[in-house]
UniProtKB/Swiss-Prot annotation:
A motif ('HIGH' region) lies at residues 123-133. This is Arginine--tRNA ligase. Belongs to the class-I aminoacyl-tRNA synthetase family. Pfam families: Arg_tRNA_synt_N (PF03485), DALR_1 (PF05746), tRNA-synt_1d (PF00750).
Length: 592
């Protein structure tokens, strides 16, 4: 129970006793640093129902609390704010109550509540994962873990875009230029090999366009008449017709990609419970179009195409079925959402982790599903996020200059290795221990740098800055965790028992207060779908711990009771760091 939850009934009782008025809600905020207090009650809303001035009202309530509530030590009133100082005994009791809770702040899933399905990654099978996919995967995975910790049952899913003209481009280029090359013969990961032929297609396509332009064609005509694009379109038609040879090639090359993706996901530390494939879902939703027509949600134009008119909602008309009866992406997404609830009947909401260029698409999708009458449609959320840039500029795709996810992770590990070696504290480590540490630091730096930023904001990712061992970075927090583990290893006495301590040092109290916030931060992060709240809370906790570490003796404290309490407090901080970082998918090293 939080401090505000503890104080609310006591303040409501005080108002009832003192003024014979009942109030439903008490407003709290964090006490400003320049004032004494641990929590602040806002007085102004009460002036609507109680005839008094803020100072008199605050003093009367404060006096009542000091006399009747054991947790309240003293108070002060500044303007319309009642600053409440909480007794040390409250914080000692709180700490003793949570000291041995291994997953403090985490809630078990409520069996009465509906589950949430979180979709992320959802790549195309024609190239490797890139930097944009890294942000997508890290956000989706982290939000799924945060929702779990907040007490939700969660399914992690992705829909793999394994069909369409872009897939046929890689297939055709491999057929033309590949000479039977395989991942084994080329020593390339399967996704990289297929991506190589996507680039080869684009090069050949551009060459043919230029040749046609030289013969007098316009660029527009050349793009349509280039022989290689016509061949790719013919291959797509064969795929749709179930041509055995094309399907066999498609399956073979897709499997190469899946094997490559699996390695990337393992290295990135993300996973999935359920896979969907566009080749299985692209026909879904067409049957729903008729339902929508019958309900008057959709309307049919004279040419036979089917639309939805969302102009009353501030949007426009959106096509859901072409005049030739073929589906559009919107139709597929409608059908896939419905299919997911059929597959997992306990799902009551979905989170779609997709870039902000699709904001409009998801507004329309969610509105359509609501209008079709699905009760779970009100619990759909688009986890929209901004582009990731490197200092050298934006990512590109077809020219082969994309920032590859595997290369990025390796670069981060190499950067961590260079910085760690420069610091020169790894003499006692074996080669394997060093390699594991470099990866832990490098990936921790990458993940933290990306996740500490509000998802909606664009990121300029600076690899060197992210691996800094000072400031708001993953390695700084990992180093603090490792420092605490060192303290615990050196504590050559029993510090397991509950300690009764009369008075807390100011830094001890501030640290316990920071720990106390963790459950509320998890709930806020879940409600806002924001790993940034977890990341920045963890940084604040670590800053508070380092201030404590600099201000008091821990193992050097002469008073055994204080020494035991400070080791226990350090241990709890480490546990919260580890728990918080687990929600971000970041590992913490036991020593650094």
């Amino acid at each position: 129970m939080s401090l505000s939850q503890i104080l609310t009934p006591s303040i409501q009782k005080a108002i009832q006793v003192l003024f014979d008025v009942s109030v439903d809600k008490i407003e709290f905020q964090t006490t400003r640093k320049e004032f004494e207090g641990d929590i602040t009650m806002v007085i102004f809303p009460l002036l609507k129902v109680i005839k008094s001035n803020p100072a008199e009202l605050g003093n009367k309530i404060g006096t009542y609390l000091v006399e009747n509530v054991s947790e309240v030590a003293r108070f002060n009133v500044v303007s319309g704010f009642l600053n409440i100082v909480i007794s040390d005994s409250y914080y000692v009791d709180f700490f003793n109550g949570i000291k041995d809770q291994k997953q403090f702040g985490f809630l078990s899933p409520n069996p009465e509540e509906k589950a949430v399905m979180v979709e992320y990654s959802s790549p195309n099978t024609n190239k490797p994962l890139h930097l944009g996919h890294v942000r997508n995967n890290l956000l989706g995975y982290s939000v799924a873990e945060i929702l779990k910790a907040s007490g939700k049952k969660v399914y992690k899913t992705q829909i793999i875009n394994d069909r369409g003209i872009h897939i046929c481009k890689s297939m055709l280029a491999w057929e033309k230029f590949g000479n039977g090359e395989t991942p084994e013969s080329s020593d390339l990961k399967g996704d990289k090999l297929v991506g190589k032929y996507y680039v080869e297609f684009d090069k050949a396509y551009k060459t043919e366009i230029n040749q046609l332009i030289e013969t007098g064609k316009t660029e527009e005509e050349a793009k349509k008449q280039a022989p290689i694009i016509i061949e790719a379109q013919e291959m797509l038609k064969k795929w749709e017709a179930g041509d055995e040879q094309v399907i066999a090639l498609w399956k073979k090359m897709n499997q190469w990609v899946y094997d490559g993706f699996a390695t990337t996901y393992t290295n990135l530390g993300v996973n999935f419970d359920k896979y969907y494939y566009e080749s299985n879902t692209y026909l879904l939703g067409k049957d729903v179009v008729q339902v929508g027509l019958d309900k008057g949600v959709f309307e049919k134009d004279p040419d036979g195409s089917v639309w939805i008119d969302l102009t009353d909602e501030g949007l426009d008309r959106k096509i859901v079925l072409r005049s030739d009866g073929t589906a559009v992406y919107m139709t597929q997404d409608i059908g896939t959402a419905i299919q997911r609830v059929k597959d997992m009947p306990d799902v009551g909401g979905m989170v779609y982790t997709v870039g902000n260029e699709q904001d409009y698409h998801f507004k329309v999708l969610f509105l359509i599903l609501k209008k079709l009458g699905f009760d779970w449609a009100s619990s759909l959320y688009h986890l929209s996020y901004g582009m990731v840039d490197l200092p050298s500029g934006k990512m590109k795709s077809r020219e082969g200059t994309v920032v590859d996810a595997d290369d990025l992770m390796q670069d981060m590990t190499d950067t961590a290795k260079q910085i760690a070696e420069d610091l020169g504290k790894l003499d006692s480590y074996s080669a394997d221990e060093k390699a594991k540490l470099y990866k832990t630091i490098g990936l921790g730096a990458l993940k933290y740098y990306i996740l500490k930023v509000d998802p909606k904001k664009r990121i300029l990712f600076n690899p060197e800055e992210s691996v800094d061992f000072a400031g708001n970075t993953g390695p700084f927090i990992q180093y603090t965790y490792a420092r605490i583990q060192s303290i615990i290893r050196k504590a050559d006495f029993d510090f397991s028992n509950k300690i009764e301590i009369e008075e807390l040092h100011e830094k001890e109290k501030e640290l316990v207060k920071q720990i106390e916030l963790f459950p509320e931060v998890i709930q806020n992060a879940a409600q806002n779908h924001s790993p940034a709240l977890i990341a920045n809370y963890t940084y604040d906790l670590v800053k508070e711990y380092n201030s404590f570490y600099q201000s008091v003796h821990i193992l050097g404290e002469a008073d055994l009771t204080k020494k035991i309490f400070r080791v226990q407090l350090s241990q709890k901080v480490a546990e919260v760091i580890k728990s918080a970082f687990s929600l971000l998918g970041i590992e913490v090293p036991e020593r650094m």
